[in-house]
């Protein structure tokens, strides 16, 4: 489980995600840097846009904290960075609302860079502004 840095002090979030995984029947392991000690995935402060080289170093370091290939997170940006680092990252909502997931069937998801995701968000906002 990768805990998002913005929830570093939100112990109830950490506990809730782990409870959901337990209730869904998934086996998971803790890593050393989690919860209050979690590391940023690299997206914080829009580093991905302002300093791509630093972004790559930060997300690679974070991904290397995991011995496992499969990572569960509850932040869309964190999921994207873990995928960029070559991990099979799954958002908790995919597990809640999707089919049962096993580590031997890595999902074929289209990977988008952070810049692509932000561009789509901006385009969606502009479309919605025209409606309202």
Model-identified regions with their sequence ranges:
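Iron-sulfur cluster-binding electron-transfer modules in prokaryotic oxidoreductases
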Residues: 1-132
């Amino acid at each position: 489980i990768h805990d998002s840095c913005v929830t570093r002090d939100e112990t109830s979030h950490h506990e809730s995600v782990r409870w959901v995984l337990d209730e869904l029947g998934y086996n998971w392991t803790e890593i050393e840097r989690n919860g209050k000690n979690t590391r940023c995935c690299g997206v914080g402060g829009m580093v991905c846009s302002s300093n791509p080289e630093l972004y790559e170093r930060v997300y690679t370091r974070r991904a290397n904290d995991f011995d496992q290939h499969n990572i569960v997170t509850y932040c869309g940006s964190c999921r994207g960075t873990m995928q960029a680092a070559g991990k099979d990252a799954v958002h908790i909502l995919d597990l809640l609302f999707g089919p049962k997931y096993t580590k031997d069937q890595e999902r074929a998801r289209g990977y988008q860079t952070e810049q692509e995701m932000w561009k789509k968000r901006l385009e969606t906002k502009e479309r919605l502004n025209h409606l309202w």
